[in-house]
């Protein structure tokens, strides 16, 4: 498959990143993540680097939907954080653990992110809220997945505001007022990711028809 969706998101910590926390909207961040899972689950593979605030959120939404999400999500987790893994990791059967490099956080995260962007073929990357890691992932995504679609959900604030500024210089055609003002995130992601509401959800990607038109719901 060549239409994986990458998610870069976090809720800024006011102690570690007060400036990002000040500009962020935690309610909007949670709503946007929930909406992205709702739109993609059973339709597109969602990939992200494990984050203690985001992974549990994705698990809850997936379980609420009653969809078998084991084949539709791909979670990368650095062994640097092995003693901090959330219990929710156990619910995901497709977790890729990456090397702890010399017990250094920067090198370990770089290793994880390089693997995410070189082992998968993405259609788009979605940036929601976040701190410095969002900027790092944006830069690496552009390097390893050049020319792919990028969606900074500006209304969530945080480091995503910096992603918008970078795109305003390098790819202004990707921007639009809806990134700031459309708070109906389900509608927003259906439109921005070009995923029709008529698309059926499938138990796993292997049985999903390659032709998008063949995935549409049809009356009996």
Where are these regions (language model features)?
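Extreme N-terminal starter segment of soluble prokaryotic enzymes
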Residues: 1-5
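Acidic/glycine-enriched connector segments
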Residues: 8-219
